[in-house]
């Protein structure tokens, strides 16, 4: 898997041509880097939802954010509310606002998220038993419709996140995902941004193309570090050539992140009604908690 660092740069003429193209970081730092102030966790009375609640509670404490718990159902609201309140009391979460909403899950949850101005939506892996996996589930419909980042929690919140990995390209949604992930990390945690120049592995590496990509991506990372106030020790990066999934799987194996951040759109971003293949793959087979922004 070919890999270059920024020391391996194009020649002077190529660098001049790159700068002349006016490559800019495609996001508004003020909007993308906003702090997490209100976390909404959806709970369906399942063990998977308990994982999400515990992680959301840890993040709320870390970020000094308000935590709300939502249950949307068409059955007995009172019984569900009593069960959830007892569960919150058992966990010692006495400062959590409990919301009970009737009606369709997706509409009820997203309407509530907008009404309380939530910055982050947290869910468990409710589609684990679905024969179709992630496809066609309530979780997929929520992800397709939510305007705020969504965190899929799959592992126990034993400790704060220590290592995050962001698949970063030049799309706005990938940049939003990286910024959202950064806000969920404590000061001692690290984030690694991975850029992949997709080529068929049978064709081998193209050193000239990869060197050009190093310069472009390096500019993006410099802008991102400035926006986040991050240094090289906390926000690192690397570039790879190869097939996207293979490169990302290799990075996950090497870094062992507790959090994976992805942009939610298809690569063309032509349609907000489409999800990228990487997002679908990792929601079906999450190696860790997965954060998606659209």
Task: Please report, for each region that a protein language model flagged, where it lies by residue.
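General small-molecule cofactor/ligand-binding pocket signal
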Residues: 68-70, 97-101, 151, 194, ...
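Small/aliphatic-rich secondary-structure junction motif
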Residues: 30-79, 163-214, 222-234
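Glycine/small-residue-rich hydrophobic helix-like segments
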Residues: 210-262
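Gly/Ser-rich helix-loop-strand patches that form or flank binding pockets
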Residues: 4-8, 16-28, 32, 108-158, ...
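Short helix-capping segments at alpha-helix termini
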Residues: 88-94, 227-232
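Charged docking surfaces used in two-component/phosphorelay signaling
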Residues: 100-108, 239-246
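Short, well-ordered secondary-structure micro-motifs
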Residues: 133-134, 177, 202-206, 247-250, ...
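Active-site phosphate/pyrophosphate- and oxyanion-stabilizing loops and adjacent acidic/basic residues
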Residues: 57, 85, 140, 179, ...
